[in-house]
């Protein structure tokens, strides 16, 4: 049987809590000691655990711990746990009294479901987006694009959704409108109305999202083409031909061991035709057994008759049999791609919205290009300051060309060297896959570069000689515009007779994967100079951003670079010997003394070549960061 006042027990259990703490938990010891002292000094009866809350220094956490100790004590002696009884409702109490009872029960932690008071369960309100809002427009756009059957990319959704909303679906950086109605996609994802998959990201309506979108369409009388828009989505655009799902990399493997009979005109045939010629040589090209029989399965050229010979496929892309209004789509190495013929696309530069002349002249480059009758566009770029794109005149789809520019003033370059941004940007530029990477160096100085003159000279030589980047040196922003206009003229001329192979990967894992797929296509298709392989602009934006999911290796390197004095070269060199932070921490734990830990990095990498060398001072700093 429990005594009428449990104060002594509560004091005893508080002392047990204090005794269970270690010396390092000094703050908790002080907290519990004050609570114990205040409880001893407080007059009154303490029976229920909730009664302890009126003591200064005892809050919900301490009360819960003492309540748990009370439950354990009651189980040991075989008695019921004290619970506050409900006041008897004799019918004279009104609704306000009933509310007070429920409130008191909630405070006391008593489950009202076990009482005669049935608390109504509040039904969760169904999420319905406001009419003409961003979420409303996105749902209707996904319904219109048939996104219940196939994923849709962000630009297609934005284009289709704009007519359903009163707000802009795209940010306007020139007017400092950095947010748009597209941000409502987060709410749709939260309420499981939209599913996001793949990289670049593709958006699909869930079953609930499809029902809600159709309800909104019917409620507002919106007329969407009744035909299943999935049929148009299967081709991604009304201008696309049906995609052949056969993987032509398998065809390449099948044909690799085959040789052709002599050609009638006696020309040399190496059988080394590109997959592009095989796939786009005819719209009716099919991989069938009887067609493979056209070639002889022999390692030497036979002397077969004319019936066994085949004609060489055309080398010039202009000879490919394509319809001007139809874009063909094929697959290679499980990646879809399209062929854009010369003349079916326009070329212009895209300028990063942060690339300005000054805070008061944010559209300098755009206006300067416009004055020279040169089209350009301002966007937020994931990488680079200026990049050239090709835009299909029929579909409006954009792809990234092989030219990217990083613009730097001398003082900005000096600061990027000092805080390691230069090496990080250089590394990302290499992963972009662009063959022509330029550093545009403006020799204007907005602030003092201090003692960075020698470092700048070294960096400029490294850019040219070691990293093989091209460099454009200008006097000021006006001179930069002239040089960029001249470069644009050269780029347009070089693509006048060039066809583009535009890639559409659906599940890129990383920036290295992005570059690897591009290299595979370049090795296969760019054997002649009249073709160029490239990713879409949307893929570039999604993959090349700094927010890309990093591997453990990249995270380790990034953390090492947070230590002042550790450059990218040093971080990469350290990571090769300590693959993860766990390896590094274990190495420090094995040191027998603090002095050994301080000298560990110096002893390992003190004689490393060049920029990889770890000095004694840097070794001590690393030990202070990771060992102590």
From Swiss-Prot:
SUPFAM superfamilies: DNA polymerase beta, N-terminal domain-like, Galactose-binding domain-like, Restriction endonuclease-like. It comes from the Eukaryota. Residues 298-310 have a biased composition (Polar residues). One of its GO terms (biological process) is double-strand break repair via break-induced replication. GO terms for molecular function: 3'-flap endonuclease activity; crossover junction DNA endonuclease activity; DNA binding; enzyme inhibitor activity; metal ion binding. Its cofactor is Mg(2+). SMART domains: ERCC4 (SM00891). Belongs to the XPF family. Interacts with EME1. This is Crossover junction endonuclease MUS81. It comes from Candida glabrata (strain ATCC 2001 / BCRC 20586 / JCM 3761 / NBRC 0622 / NRRL Y-65 / CBS 138) (Yeast). The lineage of its organism: Eukaryota, Fungi, Dikarya, Ascomycota, Saccharomycotina. The gene is MUS81.
């Amino acid at each position: 049987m429990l005594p009428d006042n449990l104060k002594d027990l509560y004091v005893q259990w508080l002392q047990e809590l204090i005794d269970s703490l270690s010396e390092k938990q000094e703050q908790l010891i002080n907290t519990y000691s004050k609570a114990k002292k205040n409880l001893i000094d407080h007059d009154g009866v303490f029976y229920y655990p909730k009664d302890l809350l009126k003591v200064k220094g005892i809050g919900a956490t301490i009360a819960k711990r003492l309540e748990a100790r009370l439950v354990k004590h009651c189980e040991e002696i075989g008695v019921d746990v004290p619970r506050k009884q409900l006041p008897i409702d004799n019918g004279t109490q009104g609704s306000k009294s009933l509310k007070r009872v429920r409130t008191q029960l909630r405070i006391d932690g008593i489950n009202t479901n076990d009482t005669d008071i049935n608390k109504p369960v509040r039904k969760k309100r169904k999420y319905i987006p406001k009419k003409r809002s961003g979420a409303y427009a996105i749902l209707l756009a996904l319904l219109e694009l048939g996104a219940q059957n196939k994923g849709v990319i962000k630009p297609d959704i934005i284009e289709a959704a704009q007519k359903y909303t009163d707000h802009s679906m795209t940010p306007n950086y020139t007017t400092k409108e950095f947010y748009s109605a597209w941000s409502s996609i987060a709410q749709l994802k939260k309420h499981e109305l939209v599913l996001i998959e793949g990289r670049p990201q593709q958006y699909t309506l869930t079953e609930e999202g499809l029902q809600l979108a159709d309800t909104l369409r019917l409620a507002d009388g919106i007329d969407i083409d009744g035909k299943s828009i999935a049929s148009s989505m299967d081709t991604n655009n009304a201008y696309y031909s049906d995609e052949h799902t056969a993987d032509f990399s398998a065809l390449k493997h099948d044909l690799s061991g085959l040789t052709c009979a002599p050609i009638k005109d006696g020309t040399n045939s190496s059988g080394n035709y590109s997959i592009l010629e095989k796939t786009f040589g005819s719209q009716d090209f099919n991989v069938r057994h009887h067609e493979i029989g056209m070639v002889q399965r022999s390692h030497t050229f036979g002397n077969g008759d004319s019936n066994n010979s085949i004609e060489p496929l055309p080398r010039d892309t202009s000879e490919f049999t394509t319809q001007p209004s139809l874009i063909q789509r094929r697959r290679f190495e499980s990646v879809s791609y399209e062929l854009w013929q010369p003349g079916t696309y326009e070329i212009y530069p895209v300028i990063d919205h942060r690339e300005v002349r000054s805070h008061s002249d944010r559209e300098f480059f755009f206006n300067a290009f416009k004055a020279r009758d040169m089209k350009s566009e301002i966007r937020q770029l994931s990488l680079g300051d200026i990049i050239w794109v090709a835009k299909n005149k029929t579909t409006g789809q954009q792809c990234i060309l092989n030219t990217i520019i990083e613009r730097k003033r001398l003082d900005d370059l000096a600061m990027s060297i000092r805080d390691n941004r230069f090496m990080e940007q250089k590394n990302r530029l290499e992963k972009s896959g662009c063959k022509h990477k330029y550093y545009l160096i403006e020799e204007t100085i907005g602030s003092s570069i201090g003692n960075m003159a020698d470092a700048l000279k070294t960096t400029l030589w490294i850019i040219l000689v070691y990293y093989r980047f091209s460099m454009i040196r200008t006097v000021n922003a006006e001179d930069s515009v002239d040089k960029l206009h001249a470069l644009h003229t050269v780029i347009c001329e070089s693509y006048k007779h060039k066809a583009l192979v535009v890639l559409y990967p659906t599940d890129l894992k990383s920036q290295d994967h992005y570059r690897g797929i591009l290299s595979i296509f370049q090795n296969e298709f760019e054997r002649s100079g009249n073709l160029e392989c490239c990713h879409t602009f949307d893929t570039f934006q999604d993959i090349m951003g700094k927010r890309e999911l990093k591997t453990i290796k990249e995270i380790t390197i990034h953390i090492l670079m947070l230590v002042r004095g550790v450059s990218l070269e040093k971080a990469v060199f350290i990571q090769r010997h300590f693959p993860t932070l766990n390896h590094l921490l274990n190495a420090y734990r094995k040191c027998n003394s603090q002095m050994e830990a301080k000298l560990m990095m110096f002893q390992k990498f003190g004689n490393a070549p060049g920029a990889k060398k770890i000095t004694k001072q840097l070794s001590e700093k690393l030990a202070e960061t990771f060992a102590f």
